[in-house]
Amino acid sequence: MTLLMQDHKSIYNKDIEILIEVEELITSVPENKKNDFKSLIDNRIMTLLNKIQHPVAAENVFGMCIAYPNTYIRYRLIDFVEKWVPYFSAVETIINLTQDPDDLVSFKAMDVCANHKIEESVAYLSSIIDDVRESISYPKKPVGLGAQKVLSTLLDIFGVEKHEELVMLKNYFDQNGILPNNFDFEEKIPQSLIEEFEKTEEDGMILIPGGFFEFGLNENEIPDKTFNWKDAVPRQKVWLPPFFIDKYPVTNKDYDIFTEFIEENGHIFCHPNEPQNKQHRRNTYWDDRYLDNHPVTGIDFYDAFAYARYKGKELPTEFQWEKAARGEKGNVWPWGDKFDPAKVQYAGSLYNEPITSLKSWRENLLKAHADKELNHLTSDIFEQNGESPYGVCGMIGGTWEWTRSELKTKRAFHPIFENVPFNSVNSFAVLKGGSFFSHPGLMFPSFRAKDIPFCRHNEMGIRCVKNIPVYKIRESINGPITNKAIY
């Protein structure tokens, strides 16, 4: 049985056994026997840790890398963390380690930031030497080796040394939160790994082939300009590896089984940054209008993330979601280029009345929310129309679906990590598809909705994807993943 076919919980259990063995070994040789201790770490401990395959087990090692009191252990564990970059928690760990008090550790973490061009580290590194545009020609304090290492790392991330080019790129970065996009080229993943992945059988999921597709629309193609549509333009060429996506959205029944698992076993598969004592039971659990085989609603980003990891899956990026909805040809809607109310469940479906104005739409929403005579707001997943070109069902209307993409950058969403105010675009994850309360202007697949990670509106649901494991891609290409659309 290949790794890609193994049940993720059995992988997790095997990895925990490795961690227990490491914990016992790591104290078996005293630190004052320097050569023996280094040999233990370099050979036995690292060999064991490099067998770890589950992201949750890997995050235990990430925690060791940040918090273990021995400097040499933190230094060596960076090699383990690096092989998981750009997985979100590996990126966060490396950035935290750039602030480590020991140069042995912090300098090595900076090397990883430079090699992988970890753009999220720019703000943290800049806090040490201030603005790189000024520091390159007029250094401020501190002025020692550490400051020069930070400056060198930032220059490697920006990829330039000339002052004029640096100013231009830093200005772009300050405005957009990222460097110019690296989405439109093929990552050279070996065909053998792709074929192994594509041959796996994923029950209830549809394989979306890898390759190029067009993300977004041109302005003249926007089907409805009632709402803010400008971040949905223009069309952009994007390359993705293959992935599996759920044919149907996750149901209330399946989600409730997950919450029972959490209540019995604890928050094993939850987001490492989720609030303490997080309650995962959906807020629609208490409303009888939301039936078992209907799409789950009333969940936030942390709920969606935890459910996906509990299933051995992930949240889709907005690129993945949009490709699955629009197909390779980039239809405006999953079924073509014209809105078809018969294929969706939206605000007009509530009372079988077309939406003629913003006023009528708003009135319908408030009426339906208070209308206890409405038997249900959502519908059975098997009764949903509007298949995508790949055969994915119910992507438009019904429920908004969480992605793991950040609104401003389209990169991985890091909730809480950046400690930004909640009116900042950095604090929003992207949602897609519209809901039973939506106006048509909110529902075309390129439309980018947003919300903060702990918002639990009764319109928010989830659909999962399964990807080639990030560390498998890293191993196969023997270097950094440079296409930023992948993670």
Swiss-Prot record:
May I ask which residue range the UniProt record assigns to the signal sequence? Answer: none
The organism's superkingdom is given as Bacteria
Coiled-coil regions listed: none
MF (Gene Ontology): formylglycine-generating oxidase activity
The UniProt entry, under InterPro entries, shows: CTDL_fold (IPR016187), Sulfatase_Mod_Factor_Kinase (IPR051043), SUMF_dom (IPR005532), SUMF_sf (IPR042095)
Q: What is this protein called?
A: Uncharacterized protein YfmG
From which organism does this entry originate? Answer: Bacillus subtilis (strain 168)
